[in-house]
Amino acid sequence: GLWETIKNFGKTFTLNILDYTK
């Protein structure tokens, strides 16, 4: 559903930011 998509996007976005700031 839409909520799962939003949550997954948030998770990947956060992980990408954390990975980028290493």
From Swiss-Prot:
Compartments in which it is found: Secreted
Main location: secreted
Gene Ontology CC, one term: extracellular region
GO biological process: defense response to bacterium; innate immune response
Residue pairs linked by disulfide bridges in the UniProt entry: none
Keywords assigned by UniProt, alphabetized: Amphibian defense peptide, Antibiotic, Antimicrobial, Immunity, Innate immunity, Secreted
Tissue-wise expression: Expressed by the skin glands.
Family membership: Belongs to the frog skin active peptide (FSAP) family. Brevinin subfamily.
Purpose: Has antibacterial activity.
Protein name, as recorded: Brevinin-2LTa
Species: Rana latastei (Italian agile frog)
